[in-house]
Amino acid sequence: MLMGRLFVKRLCLGMFAFLLLASFTTAQSTQKPLTIETAFAEGGITGRTPESIQWSPDSTTMSFIQRDDAGQRGELWTFNPATAEKKVLVGDAKLTQLSPPLSRLKDDRERERITRYHVEPYIWSPDSRHLLFNSLGQLWLYTIANGTAVQFSSSPHSAGDPKFSPNGKRLAYLRDHDLYVRPVGDGDEQQLTQKGSEDLLNGEVDWVYAEELSVRSNYFWSPDGRDIAFLRMDESKIPAYPIVNWMPTHPTVDFEKYPKAGDLNPVVRLGVVSASGGKTRWISPAQDADIYIPRFGWVRDGLLWFQVLNRAQDKLDLYFADTRTGQSRKMLTETAANAWVYVNDDFRVLKSGDRFLWPSWRDGATQLYLYSFNKATPLASDAHLERQLTQGDFEVLGVKGLDDSAGLVYFSCNKDDPRQRQLYSVKLDGSGLQRISREEGSHDATFSDDGKHYYDTFSALMTPPRLSACDSAGSCNNIWESRNVEPYGLTPPKFLEFKANDGTTLYGQLLLPPASAASGKIPLIVNIYGGPAAQLVQNTWIENWSGSSGLFHQILSREGFAIFTVDNRGTPARNRKFQTAVRHQFGAIELQDQLAALDQLFAQYPQLDRTRVAIWGWSNGASMTIYAMTHSDLFKAGAAVSPVTNWRNYDSIYTERNNGLPTDKTSTSYTDLDLPKVADKLHGSLLLLHGTSDDNVHFQNSIQMVEALVEAGKQFHFMVYPNKTHSIAGATDQTHLFHLIEDHFLRELK
């Protein structure tokens, strides 16, 4: 009897094990394969996210463009938060005419400009009854009521940055480096500025202001529509960098105005011109021509505000100016000793017309402050600090909306965790700090003009993007969701914490290979950025941003690699002390933090193989990759995509903000990160990759590195992407690039 029971028990256990194995085998067989081809295909594994998401001026409607994976076909949708109605406003056939796919642009640099700087393909009219489309430089006016579109201008020359007057009766735009205006109905256009050229930009944004100061427009209508304020940029003294198209039989050259560290900058001047034409009235805030005017706008009719940033970027002045008399007054000055003053879009004048918001990290972290001024005689006295609205050891990451009627400011911050982005509100009296967003992860909100609704793009580490329309209390309706990624069986990385040598907390993450892919000691790949422009360790979905592809790392982990990332001191979204730790001394501290974190990682995870470690990065991460391989013998291999190899090669605003002028004797960055000079110190196998049309980090950087490595007798691998820009965008090129990096690590570490 006992034997019989034992037999039955063993039989049941055997059947259970068989069924479990069969279930596991079935799950494996139904799991979708994740390959470099699928990860970097157009649309990726999640689908193409909605584009050009906007609120109508009357705050009743949210609009967006949804395209197919290839980006060739699409529709413009609207959503009404009051009724929860979602519908197609402009169908595929009409949208193809009004907003053609970017693939029709043959110039990679222009495509990158549009995507990188979020150039909108359409804008709403002030009465919310029309849309103005920019179809490859040709303007079309679309009437919502009847679904018809008429071409606004038939000029063979492209028009850019179009804007309706506040009453919607006129339209301003840029053409051939000058500012024009014309009636929306019948009537002729009028040229408002003169002598525009590639050396003289009237109302147009140049490359360095767009890239490093996030300037998206350089002209603005007055509230009454009578005047336009604009910035003139004189670039005649700026050196031009040649970008060569090598593909024709006879190569062509395009010259880009690009001020490098220590070079002359654009000379800027703020002007006001009547929308009816006439002489420009110039506003002259400072005697020093070597300044930046990074932001300006209208306080009210006849009263301008503008900011003046010194070249060292450690002093920012706010001015008010009477456009009728030309008189101006400095309202406040923001200084940052041994640091820099951040320029952003958080200056907001309240509807009361006598108060404004002002961001500052004067107390050690970026917080919001409320100032007031004399509404009747604004130039009679300085601005007065009313109160600090937020405080704490967290970063306010952007004002997202204002509800003046409720006395509320909505803003993004990382109060809960430096790796998250949450939406908060605070009252204008400084009380009632409250979190609005609910889910853990990263929320990017944009409010309607009345401050009553917002759209939220949300994602988390293992949750791909989702678009929602929400009320100000945080109750949301889903508008769009990514495709389900569960069939790909992605492995969640582990969030980790480390200590720098000075005790500072560093945040990192580790992705270990699945048990089926691991055998013996595990080789480790370090992904690095390490600079002021990017935080890699976040609770957000990173599918295929070039510098840190989460899906590429998932693929590597299935090949038996562990992937590690840590944000060293000098990366953003932490307090002032953390961000400025590397000021004037790029390289050494970043590498110290990386190596300190790696020592702690190896102690915590003894299965990692210290003798098989690689490193890779893009842009600043590529610079740090080469720096690490020339200043440490830990790394057996590395891949550097589009690196700065000498900071004298990079643009003036970014470089000098962090490193001072090349003549500054207190800065070591120009000597310590002159990577060609230490080419003979290279350890490990280097793969270097760059696009020849990179207008951001010039191809010149890699050419100089190649020459130095050859002179030093160092063997290395070099891949050139013809006519590709900094992002080396496109499914074909990205697939090729990431296969190269994959093969490099398989060859060197396996």
Residue ranges of predicted features:
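Disordered, low-complexity tails and leader-like regions
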Residues: M1-L2, T78, G530
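Short alpha-helical segments used as structural interaction elements across diverse proteins
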Residues: L6-F7, K257, V566, A731
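Beta-propeller folds
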Residues: L13-F18, S23-H453, S459-T463, A469-S472, ...
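Generic detector of N-terminal low-structure segments
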Residues: K9, F18-L20, T26, I563, ...
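Basic side chains
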Residues: K9-R10, R182, R232, R269, ...
